[in-house]
From Swiss-Prot:
This is RNA polymerase sigma factor RpoD. Belongs to the sigma-70 factor family. RpoD/SigA subfamily. Interacts transiently with the RNA polymerase catalytic core. One of its GO terms (molecular function) is sigma factor activity. Residues 543-596 are annotated as: Sigma-70 factor domain-4. It comes from the Bacteria. The gene is rpoD.
């Protein structure tokens, strides 16, 4: 059985340490046949030399060996083991080095272990815990609940769909269902492959029951009013108020908000926190420059429960040499503190409470983000296995992987472990949907809508069936009859389905000509037409030269020969200062002369057959 390169190199280093030297032939015998790059071989020889092992053309004499043996005896076994491990790790990285992005991606992906069903549930629970932590924190921000209730009012008025507000509801008492349907779903997943291009709204997430949603929102609204009443009549830190706030959080975290609504609530909280930080930075800048207050002390001031306490602490820490200078910026600091108090009035929370809520939101988001990252990285192999089936359809393999990864991330966001099926079963649909959608949108030079792509695929499938049945390509009439689509639409689809081709496409075996060389340029006159026109002009000029000057000019003006346009009898008459009747007579006489066989024969050959 052939050993791997690392094992062979380890034996080589051990052998070299024992005898004190290595010959080039011994190195060549021990190295794998896969190592053929001269740079890799040079690196290996250099590292062996650095370990104190001589690399020579032939075995050295006995004196040199004795000297090397004395030097080698000074080295401990630990030193040898450490040096061997170092060279092995270095060579291992050299052997695995590649510039191919697909191989680099595969190698990085291979370091992540696959998940078991229990591992998936564990990560899904961590994601859910992180989201619950965010929602429980947001529930303490009154504006968030108000916004959600306002959005539900829009749903009841028909201005917003319920599916645009929530995905559904989480039952905290429900456990993951272990069913036997998973294998059945996996078995039949290929049968539903033709449904990959359906809209995202038609995924396997069940539609939210409007009656259940109404009950949940009524419960949320009632608890919100109870909590507000407790805050107004009692202190927010009162035991009864804290119980009501906790009840509100428990109800609110059961709502599975769509990402857009969830982000809106968090962003509003972030904006409020940003306002506070801006004002605190302004206070810190003034106090440090004009009051000589240490920055560390200021940070302690900003952690106080009430805004008015910040001002008193600042005043207490101003030392005598700085009092006069600080008095000049008193109004500015008091103005900033008023802005902070305005934020407290808008939110109904103290600055300390807003910071606390924001901190818990950040921790919850970080927890959910880490868990989602683990779930995505553990299922990257699934994306590659699906993307392989869609190669040669107009997109690079790496592009297919990236689009599939986007679908995988959507699946992680929407996965519900309580349903009982494995994550891979659910994610497969989203990955396929993302890949097929990207192929429809990006694979063609001229984008075709998704619904038309489906029609084209159906037409191609039926066309192949008819070809197998009758042995020839079907006509548009036959396709129309089989697909129950009007014939004119069939012709339109066939026209759209044609792929564009580059004019630089090589033609012939030598590739010395391109397709564009054989296409007619309709903007340029054909050589035959150009030669015919030149001959006609010459013949006409020759024929007219046999007439009188007056007759030739009348014919030129009447028929627009060598002129921009023709002229009427009156216009020609004015030119010659005669009547239109006289011009008509001159024209008739000149035409009779041209009809003479000696002249007409010259022009007759130009008449169209």
């Amino acid at each position: 059985m052939e050993q791997n390169p690392q094992s062979q190199l380890k034996l080589l280093v051990t052998y070299g340490k024992e005898q004190g030297y290595l010959t080039y032939s011994e190195i060549n015998d021990h190295l794998s046949d896969n190592i053929i790059n001269s740079d890799q071989i040079e690196d290996i020889i250099q590292m062996i030399n650095d370990m104190g092992i001589q690399v020579v053309e032939k075995a050295p004499d006995s004196d040199d060996l004795i000297l090397h043996e004395i030097k080698r005896n000074n080295e401990t076994d630990e030193d040898i083991v450490e040096a061997t491990a170092q060279v092995l790790s270095t060579v291992e990285s050299e052997l695995g080095r590649t510039t191919d992005p697909v191989r680099m991606y595969m190698r990085e992906m291979g370091t992540v272990e696959l998940l078991t069903r229990e591992g998936e549930i564990d990560i899904a629970k961590r994601i859910e815990d992180g989201i619950n932590q965010v929602q429980c924190s947001v529930a303490e921000y009154p504006e968030a609940i108000t916004h959600l209730l306002e959005q539900y009012n829009r749903v009841e008025l028909g201005e917003l769909r319920l599916s645009e507000l929530i995905h559904g509801f989480v039952d905290p008492n429900a456990e993951a269902v272990h069913t036997s349907i998973t294998n059945h779903i996996n078995t039949n997943s290929e049968e539903h492959h033709h449904n990959d291009n359906t809209e995202e709204n038609n995924d396997d997430d069940h539609l939210v029951d409007p009656e259940l949603a109404r009950e949940k929102f009524i419960a949320l609204k009632n608890q919100y009013h109870i909590t507000n009443y407790a805050i107004k009549t009692k202190n927010r830190n009162h035991q009864d108020t804290l119980i009501e706030i906790n009840n509100l959080s428990e109800i609110f975290k059961q709502f599975r908000l769509v990402p857009k609504q969830f982000d809106h609530l968090v962003i509003n909280m972030r904006k409020m926190m940003q306002k506070i930080r801006i004002q605190e930075r302004n206070i810190a800048k003034l106090c440090i420059e004009y009051g000589n207050i240490p920055k560390k002390a200021l940070l302690n001031f900003f952690s106080l429960q009430k805004t008015n306490q910040i001002w008193s602490k600042i005043v207490q820490n101003i030392k005598k040499p700085w009092i006069d200078k600080f008095n000049t910026i008193k109004p500015d600091i008091q103005m900033i503190l008023k802005k902070l108090q305005k934020v407290e009035e808008e939110t109904g929370l103290t600055i300390h409470q807003v910071k606390n809520i924001n901190k818990r939101i950040s921790l919850g988001e970080a927890k959910a983000k880490r868990a989602k990252k683990e779930m995505v990285e553990a299922n990257l192999r699934l994306v590659i296995s699906i993307a392989k089936k869609y190669t040669n359809r107009g997109l690079q393999f790496l592009d297919l992987i990236q689009e599939g990864n986007i679908g995988l991330m959507k699946a992680v966001d929407k996965f519900e472990y309580r349903r009982g099926y494995k994550f891979s079963t659910y994610a497969t649909w989203w990955i396929r949907q993302a890949i097929t959608r990207s192929i429809a949108d990006q694979a063609r030079t001229i984008r075709i809508p998704v619904h038309m792509i489906e029609t084209i695929n159906k037409l191609n499938r039926i066309s192949r069936q008819i070809l197998q049945e009758i042995g020839r390509e079907p006509t548009p009439e036959e396709l129309s009859e089989r697909m129950l689509i009007p014939e004119d639409k069939i012709r339109k689809v066939l026209k759209i389905a044609k792929e564009p081709i580059s004019m630089e496409t090589p033609i012939g075996e030598d590739d010395d000509s391109h397709l564009g060389d054989f296409l007619e340029d309709t903007n340029i006159e054909l050589p035959l037409d150009s030669a015919t026109s030149a001959s006609l002009r010459s013949a006409t000029k020759n024929v007219l030269s046999g007439l009188t000057t007056r007759e030739a000019k009348v014919l030129r003006m009447r028929f627009g020969i060598d002129m921009n346009t023709d002229h009427t009898l009156e216009e020609v008459g004015k030119q010659f200062d005669v009547t239109r009747e006289r011009i008509r007579q001159i024209e008739a006489k000149a035409l009779r002369k041209l009809r003479h066989p000696s002249r007409s024969e010259i022009l007759r050959s130009f008449l169209d057959d």
